[in-house]
Structures are given as C-alpha cells and as structure tokens.
Amino acid sequence: GLVARKRGTMVFLASVAGQIGSQTDPPYSASKAANINFAQCLAKDLAPHGVRVNTVCPGMVKTPLNEAVWRAWHDRQPAGTARSYEDWAGEKIRALLPLGRWQTPADIANMVVFLSSERAAQMTGQTVNVDGGFVMHW
C-alpha cells in the first residue's frame, strides 16, 4: 500500500456545504464536514509515511442532479414571475458566485489531478474549494 511504498496521495471529495452548512439538508452538510475532518486526521497520521491527503470541496457544479434540484426550486416561484429556467438560474448563479458561473465536473477533476501530481508535493491536510468564490475565508 501507500505506507509500505512511503509515498502516495489520497484526495477526498466533500462539499462547501461541509464548511458553511445547509439550511435545506443538515445531514448532508454534517457528513461532508466529517469527511473534511477525517481527511485532515489521515493527513496527520500518514504524513510521516510520505502519504499526502487532501480534500476538494466543489461548490455549484452543473450536474443533472443539481439541475433537477434547481429546476424544482424554479418551478416553485410565484406566478407572474415566470422566466425561463436558464435566465432565472443564470441570474441566481451570478448573484451567488463572484466568478459568476457554474462549476463543471472538469473543474473539479482538474483540481483532483493537480493534488495528485508532484506539483502539489508540499500539500497535505488541505481543503481546497473549487466553488467560483462562493466560500471565502478571510
């Protein structure tokens, strides 16, 4: 395994919901927070063995599941405010995210590849948000 080889990397996937909480799905947020913490514990345990452990936290990723959730939200808007889903969702995303666009699965994959590479050789125990600026720690 990784410890026997004295090198390797693990990348966990969590969510920004694990950092800021979710009013609509507290169990999801709690499980993602636990994921982040578990990865940090592993990072401390495995660093002396040359194994790096990091976490990627996606934000608003444009996936079929997220689109279904957002469409359901859109469909509950008051009558008379009818706008296309695309216009409505685009406005919401631009208001929520400083970079003003959905993340894509490729955005998340690119960070996982980076963290798995030698370019990230000095990174362990880190939680990296790929979220268009949604969560900013000052």
Describe the predicted segments one by one.
Residues 15:
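Residue(s) in the substrate-gating loop at a strand-loop-helix junction
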